[in-house]
Amino acid sequence: MLYRSDMKQVRTILVLAAVLWTGCTQAPQAPQAQTEEAKQVQAGGEGKTYTFLGEDKEASKIIVIGTKVTGRHEIRFPIKEATATLTNECISGGKIVLDIANLEVLDLQGKEKAKLEGHLKSPDFFEAEKYPEGVFEVTGCERDRGDTLYLSGNLTLRGVTKSIRFPALYKYDPNQPTLEASFNINRQEWGISYKGKADNLIRDEVNIQVRLRGRAAGV
């Protein structure tokens, strides 16, 4: 038989569990990228070559959002290289190189910002000293309705390469083509398995947001 004090403790535990469960920040709602073993990258392709680098940081950027029990963090991965071969219908080839070694936490300042950036570069996460770059190489493209297409490519992080497929909005303009996407991946697929503290566990689902605005190569 449970006494009143015991029942009170049980209720308290249940309430705390409910708070932790409902309060755990979820990854942003977005399509889950299909993940498979790496595929062969096709050389060349029809279309015009564009670059997606420029002085305007907001024009082309890649943001990763990670979540945990107590909240979330937004991390920008600087783009070192970004080129693609485009037609008005699809993307026939392309490569993006990310500067993992110079990642930037966007939602913190000062010592907290520096501390988290250092931890993200450590072996617990991206091991930036050993793997200073991340790479995405296009392997396929399928046109869907309207401006939507499905882009496939090999994503390499921490020396692990997996094929991913995700939807994106693609608008072809001969002078300034754009591509935008938001999708989720499971970080465990790339060996990023740090769990976090017992009372502040990190979710496996990570959101990737892509915004690219191009200009003809050589212009």
At which residue positions do the language-model features occur?
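Low-complexity, acidic/polar, glycine-enriched regions of mature
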Residues: 24-219
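Sec-dependent bacterial lipoprotein signal peptides
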Residues: 1-22
